[in-house]
């Protein structure tokens, strides 16, 4: 089993592996590979040229430090329970360290994964809050481009927040939308008559009015806060500074 950056001829295998691992639609997968994927931000394990597993990340920044947001690890069903996830995680840490990254972030989706990543050197560092609400009287808002969203987000981010721009926002915009109001900034995904506020910065009390303005009956929002455990962090050099807020989590 060899671990390396993927080649161009392996991309169709990576697409198939993603679908087998996560069950996403062809449209979603096409969006990721068109706007979020980069061979230099992927490590894949292959046996005789056949891709068995792959790890993907996005670049991020915190107080001048270069971070990697480890987004996904996909393993082919035929190669599961062979330690490939752990091998890819170890390889990624070594690779990122060699390329001058200061730290790595990831977001576990359950307590079991949180414990597993803890054994790999990751520790809890960030928190978030979430809430649901019904629609209220509409507030003024407007759609914004990813460039304007990036500029405004730097103004709204908490002082201990991670900057996520470039490919992060290009990919996010393939399935979500960006909005700005007088005192808030929102990245949101439409889901039938419900809205998922992936990140609401600024005035969280505007949430019911946001739903009213966009025509949704109810929604669920993630905001800065301390109610829930968030991202985990692994320093890749001595003295790397850990963030306290990591908001754009690609669920």
Predicted regions and their residues:
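Conserved beta-strand in the GNAT
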Residues: 44, 50-60, 67-74, 105, ...
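Conserved acetyl-CoA pyrophosphate-binding loop and the N-cap/start of the following alpha-helix
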Residues: 79-91, 206-210
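Non-catalytic positions within long, well-ordered alpha-helices that form the structural scaffold/packing
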Residues: 97, 118, 211-215
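C-terminal functional modules
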Residues: 228-251
């Amino acid at each position: 089993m060899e671990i390396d950056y993927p080649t161009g001829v392996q991309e169709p295998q990576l697409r198939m592996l993603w679908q087998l691992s996560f069950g996403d639609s062809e449209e979603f997968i096409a969006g990721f590979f068109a706007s979020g994927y980069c061979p230099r931000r992927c490590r894949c394990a292959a046996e005789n040229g056949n891709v068995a597993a792959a790890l993907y990340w996005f670049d991020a920044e915190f107080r001048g430090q270069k971070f990697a947001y480890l987004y996904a690890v996909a393993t082919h069903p035929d190669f599961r329970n062979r330690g490939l996830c752990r091998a890819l995680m170890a390889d990624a840490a070594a690779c990122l360290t060699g390329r001058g990254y200061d730290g790595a972030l990831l977001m576990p989706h359950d307590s079991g994964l949180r414990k597993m990543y803890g054994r790999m050197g990751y520790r809890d560092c960030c928190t978030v809050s979430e809430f649901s609400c019904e629609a209220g009287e509409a507030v003024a808002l407007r759609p914004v481009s990813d460039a304007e969203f990036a500029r405004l987000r730097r103004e709204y981010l908490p002082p201990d927040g991670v900057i996520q721009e470039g490919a992060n926002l290009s990919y996010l915009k393939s399935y979500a939308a960006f909005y700005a109001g007088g005192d808030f900034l929102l990245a949101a995904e439409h889901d039938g008559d419900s809205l998922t506020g992936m990140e609401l910065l600024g005035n969280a009390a505007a949430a019911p009015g946001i739903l009213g303005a966009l025509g949704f009956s109810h929604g669920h929002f993630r905001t800065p806060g301390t109610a829930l455990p968030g991202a985990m962090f692994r320093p890749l050099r001595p003295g790397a500074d850990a963030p306290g807020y990591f908001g754009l989590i690609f669920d």
